[in-house]
Amino acid sequence: MKFEAILFDCDGVLVDSEPITHGVLRQMLAERGWDMPIAECMRHFIGRTVRSQAALIAARTGRPLTDDWMTAFYARRDAELHARLQAIDGAPQAVRAAHAATGGRIACASGADRGKVVLQLRKTGLDAWFGPHVFSGHDLPRSKPAPDVYLAAARALGVAPARCLVIEDTVTGVQAGVAAGATVWGYCAQGADGGPLVEAGATRLFARMGQLPELWM
């Protein structure tokens, strides 16, 4: 295998969290007066932190985004994730195969807050494969689309970014991996439009996580 390390995004790649997270976000924004379909909510926020959209939220709701509101959002989101979250079909097998193929040089590098990432990996049993190599953009100077989280993951694994394969599902995530100097493949579920991922720099698209081990051999 030409890659020495494999770096996975979390939301939408390893765990099917996006509908849950954005369902809670949509509901809480509706309570503030910004009511929209779930598809519109995901279009505004997927691949981005809620705080990065503070100006948009303030403009649509007429109220600033506060720490208290974020704390309430995290609590409601995490309760729903704990109750309902499942791994993406094929993700456990892909992670296990990546661990074996790289001699354990794998990492989870997410733009989400660390508490969410850790909760999700534990809930799905994927935490055992990543060990200490779990990285959050919230812990770094810049989150995705900046490369910081992928650079931190590569550095911790002792692998040059150019020898890393990044698995992503959003434009901002692909941009982060490309900016880090890694090869980026885009996970694009059947029927989804992969064009934006390719435009952002993904060199390969695939539709099933379970097929991933066949592709890097």
Question: Where are the model-predicted features located?
Answer:
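N-terminal helical cap/lid subdomain that shapes the substrate entry/recognition surface
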Residues: 2-10, 14-100, 115
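Conserved phosphate-coupling serine/threonine residues in phosphotransfer and NTP-handling enzymes
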Residues: 110
